[in-house]
Amino acid sequence: MNDLTLSPIAIIHTPYKEKFSVPRQPNLVEDGVGIVELLPPYNSPEAVRGLEQFSHLWLIFQFDQIQQGKWQPTVRPPRLGGNQRVGVFASRATHRPNPLGLSKVELRQVECINGNIFLHLGAVDLVDGTPIFDIKPYIAYADSEPNAQSSFAQEKLPVKLTVEFTEQAKSAVKKREEKRPHLSRFIRQVLEQDPRPAYQQGKPSDRIYGMSLYEFNVKWRIKAGTVNCVEVIEIEKDK
């Protein structure tokens, strides 16, 4: 059997600058939208002809921020608290023999401008700059299975956490909402999902976490089931 070499056909632009803040599913953070940019020679209008007639897409992508090495036959899914093991092929874990992922996303617009092609998407669960290897239309009658059994992922995700902003964080966000109109709402949506690793969730801690969203470093802590957004700092670009 011959090995297969893949080349990216596109990259995706998202607000998530690191994997720590990425939601676990694409529909959890409504304001966390993305844009797929097709790369040459695949940025031809002919390649996306008719795509606008579909409301949703499948993206096949690379977990490019995962350190590659010897794969393990079992993994610890976050939905099981990060403590119970299942087979790697019975999970959607990022650490896989081949670092490929599959994501269903909403297609909002196909834009062809100045020789470039952009696919404007709804909520996504991918890190900024993630390589895309293929794009396929979601076909409802074939892809939807209402009676499917999903083992440990059958139930919906836990209740969202309450999010509060310090006065300092509120002030910082307000100053930047002309450029990022929904910044406060977006940060709230990310934090209420509890971005911490599964094994840390539900445990008391005074630790202050930080994550990069757009061009901001967002600092926060969790106490008694409430997320407190402590600080929002604009990240200085390298000169």
Swiss-Prot record:
Question: Do you know which CDD domains this protein is assigned to?
Answer: UPF0066 (cd09281)
Q: Which residues cross the membrane?
A: none
Quote the InterPro entries the UniProt record gives. TrmO-like_N, TrmO_C, UPF0066_cons_site, YaeB-like, YaeB-like_sf, YaeB_N_sf
Gene Ontology process terms (BP)? tRNA methylation
| First-tier enzyme category under EC | transferase
Query: Is Ribonucleoprotein among this UniProt entry's keywords?
Result: no
Q: Which residues form the TsaA-like domain?
A: 6-147
Q: Which keywords describe this protein according to UniProt?
A: Methyltransferase, RNA-binding, S-adenosyl-L-methionine, Transferase, tRNA processing
GO molecular function terms listed in the Swiss-Prot or TrEMBL record: tRNA (L-threonylcarbamoyladenosine(37)-C2) methyltransferase activity; tRNA binding
The EC number on file is: 2.1.1.-
Q: What does this protein do?
A: S-adenosyl-L-methionine-dependent methyltransferase responsible for the addition of the methyl group in the formation of N6-methyl-N6-threonylcarbamoyladenosine at position 37 (m(6)t(6)A37) of the tRNA anticodon loop of tRNA(Thr)(GGU). The methyl group of m(6)t(6)A37 appears to slightly improve the efficiency of the tRNA decoding ability. Binds to tRNA.
Q: Which NCBIfam families match?
A: tRNA_TsaA
Name the family. Belongs to the tRNA methyltransferase O family.
Name-wise, this protein is: tRNA (adenine(37)-N6)-methyltransferase
